């Protein structure tokens, strides 16, 4: 289906979320102030030329004459758009130095949801991460649904290097993207793979990363690499590349090559 418009997503919100902004809601929205008005339910897409111009301006114009390799900014449903209860998370935002890599996950939840139900799915995952796992906030930096919609995950600003909780040992200098569903025996929808490519083309591009490239991340300690080891990884990796796990499912993992190629093309490489 076509990506849900922000107002379509808004319709599924609880009454409380549609009320005036609380201090926590305002803070979660203000970190996206360069991209969307305060209280916006979505960040609107921007074409590649304007995305490049914004990036050059943000860096004070101190780039080489070459235009930056960055994909067009995709539309992103904000936390307000999916009805995140901002009182659940820790109040302060946590950041990391840069974004050198993206780890792709599956949420290991059901595949039979309707895209109009996604705000409710995200609220459940959020509550689980905070209440059951004891994390400071939603673990993933972004979520993607089967219709190709992209959602803001952990609060702190969609264009910023927000520290997530997604790949034990490699949360620093990376981002985590959860594709909603389970892709062990079912293939991911094409729209979801394309959305991963669009999101990474933009977000990795903001930090100068090539989606088809390799990078080094220092392990913080996990079940695959000992703490302190420098690990060479694809810039777009699966969860299993940094941690011994089935995630993101065999059939989504097989599509990461497609996501890398499309993302690089969207960056103009």
Label every PLM stretch briefly.
Residues 3-96, 101-103, 107, 146-161, ...:
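Basic/polar, cationic surfaces and motifs that engage anionic cell-wall
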Residues 88, 97-132:
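Active-site acidic/histidine clusters and adjacent loop/turn architecture
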Residues 136-137:
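Carboxylate/His-rich catalytic cores and anion/metal-binding grooves
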């Amino acid at each position: 289906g076509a990506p849900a418009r922000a107002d379509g997503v808004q319709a599924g919100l609880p009454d409380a979320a549609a009320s005036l902004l609380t201090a926590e809601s305002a803070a979660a929205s203000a970190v996206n102030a360069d991209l969307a008005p305060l209280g916006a339910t979505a960040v609107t897409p921007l074409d590649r030329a304007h995305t490049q111009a914004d990036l050059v301006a943000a860096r004070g114009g101190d780039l080489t004459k070459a235009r930056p390799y960055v994909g067009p900014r995709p539309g992103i449903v904000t936390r307000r758009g999916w009805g995140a209860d901002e009182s659940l998370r820790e109040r302060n935002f946590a950041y990391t130095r840069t974004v050198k890599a993206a780890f792709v996950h599956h949420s290991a939840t059901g595949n039979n949801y309707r895209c109009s139900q996604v705000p409710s799915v995200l609220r459940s995952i959020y509550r689980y991460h905070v209440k059951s796992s004891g994390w400071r906030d939603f673990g993933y930096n972004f979520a993607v649904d089967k219709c190709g919609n992209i959602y803001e995950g952990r609060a702190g600003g969609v264009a910023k290097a927000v520290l997530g909780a997604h790949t034990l040992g490699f949360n620093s200098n990376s981002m985590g993207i959860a594709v909603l569903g389970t892709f062990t025996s079912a293939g991911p929808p094409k729209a979801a793979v394309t959305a991963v490519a669009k999101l990474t083309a933009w977000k990795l591009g903001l930090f100068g990363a090539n989606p088809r490239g390799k990078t080094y991340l220092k392990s913080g300690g996990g079940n695959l690499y000992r703490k302190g080891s420098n690990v060479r990884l694809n810039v777009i990796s699966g969860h299993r590349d940094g941690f011994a796990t089935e995630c993101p499912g065999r059939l989504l993992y097989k599509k990461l090559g497609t996501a890398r190629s499309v993302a690089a093309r969207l960056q103009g490489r």
